[in-house]
Regions:
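Short, well-structured beta-strand/strand-turn elements
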Residues: 5, 296-310, 372-377
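Aromatic-enriched alpha-helical interface/lid elements that frame and gate functional surfaces
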Residues: 211-298, 302
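N-terminal helix-loop segment corresponding to the beta1-alpha1 unit
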Residues: 1-167, 198-199, 357, 363-385
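Substrate-binding/catalytic subdomain of NAD(P)-dependent oxidoreductase enzymes
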Residues: 159-203
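Terminal low-complexity tails and localization/encapsulation signals of metabolic enzymes
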Residues: 216, 258-259, 310-385
Length: 385
């Protein structure tokens, strides 16, 4: 987004470098693709905040910075005398954004957490999965990513305020609350209906009917919106290839006045399930792309449940030049990156540098702070950088 971002790591490197998946570098050593993905376009320095000299260098950097973003436990930076109050005296316009599991206040503020714990405390697993089975965790960790995106938005807003008022502020982001914001219309249910929203899994409520939205096909799954035009389209497709019952052929879901309190075992539900079973059987012998191409040609709300490999080969993403090959010196080869999440006509986003190695920009950044080469060498020898 145009900012110069400096990633500060301990002299031995961030623990994030130990997070998989891994691939071998040019020397045959495993390197984290997670690190490579989330730290492109950043400069990297190594600095020990546990030493007086390291903290003095950090304060010099703070004095020249617009914002800092960190995810230490609440109170940790204060214990080093480099918390928000101290930093604000050095740089009154500074925006200090903290991302922690439960925020910096409240009875859980000091608790250590993991993605699973924070997601669970935020309610995400409870609304995920099937109603007749236990809650499930979304496969890839989400809490930190959701909190990070909210921290980004809040930091940009705080920077705008700082620019206009010359006054910085502390932005306190709770992962638990960030996760809660992903629940959308589930949160008002207890207050309005006296009950929690139930897990729907591959189904969605259509009045009293649990309408299937995910169907197995020959090579995977497709998602379908069970509205009239889509159902009519698939019934028409079936009638072209197989013989179907007249009752199914004349089916029209819109003729029913379905309400949440309608009989779930009534005639309407029975007819709907018969149609659903017929569609389920028909789709089981079709491939994802057969189904998707038919849906596109007929304007039906159906899409394949893409695997990562499917996404990688998506003609839509290819047409938007989404994938970007970036040369990584550590790997000695190009690594394919996800491209920018949006396109800007006048100021296009791009990946212009790979993720940094440990301390790869030490000399550049420390020189800008008035630290000479001989001092940098001495700091490195003492393990401060």
């Amino acid at each position: 987004m145009g900012a110069e971002v400096i990633k500060i790591e301990p002299p031995g490197g961030s623990q994030t470098r130990l997070r998989g998946p891994f691939t071998k570098d040019s020397d045959g050593k495993p390197r984290s693709l997670y690190w490579a993905s989330y730290n492109s376009n950043k400069k990297g320095i190594s600095l020990s905040l546990d030493t007086d000299e390291g903290r003095q260098i950090f304060l010099k950097l703070v004095n020249k910075s617009d914002a800092i973003l960190e995810s230490f436990q609440p109170g940790y930076l204060d214990s080093l005398n480099i918390g928000f109050e101290t930093l604000a005296k050095i740089n009154p316009k500074l925006v200090h954004t903290s991302m922690t599991p439960f925020g910096s206040t409240g009875p859980y503020a000091g608790f250590i957490s993991t993605d699973l714990i924070t997601s669970s405390m935020g309610g995400m697993p409870f609304v995920s999965g099937d109603e007749d089975r236990p809650p499930v965790r979304i496969s890839f960790p989400q809490a930190e990513l959701v909190a990070g995106s909210q921290a980004f938005g809040a930091t940009v807003a705080a920077l705008r305020h700082s620019r206009n008022s010359k006054t910085g502020q502390h932005v306190d982001v709770s992962e638990q609350i960030a996760v809660m914001w992903t629940l959308m219309n589930a949160t008002p249910f207890p207050q309005l209906h006296g009950t929690d929203v139930t897990r729907a899994g591959a189904f969605r409520k259509r009045g009293p009917i649990d309408a299937r939205h995910v169907f197995r096909c020959a090579d995977g799954y497709v998602s379908m919106n069970a509205q009239a035009k889509t159902l009519d389209g698939f019934i028409g497709w079936m009638s072209e290839e197989i013989e179907i019952e007249k009752e199914i052929l004349g089916f029209n879901i819109d003729k029913w006045n379905l309400k949440p309190d309608s009989d779930p075992n009534g005639k309407e539900a029975s007819e709907f399930k018969k149609v659903e079973k017929a569609i389920e059987s028909f789709l089981s012998i079709k491939t994802k792309m057969e189904i998707f191409e038919r849906a596109l040609s007929a304007g039906l709300l159906v899409a394949p449940c893409n695997t990562v490999e499917d996404i990688r080969k998506s003609p839509q993403l290819e047409a938007r030049s989404f994938w970007i090959d970036v040369y990584h010196p550590e790997f000695g080869k190009d690594i394919t990156h996800l491209g920018p999440y949006m396109k800007m006509s006048e100021t296009p986003l791009k990946i212009y540098s790979p993720s940094p190695s440990v301390g790869s920009h030490n000399e550049e950044i420390f020189k800008s702070l008035g630290i000479g080469k001989s001092e940098i060498k001495a700091l490195r020898k003492r393990g401060i950088i």
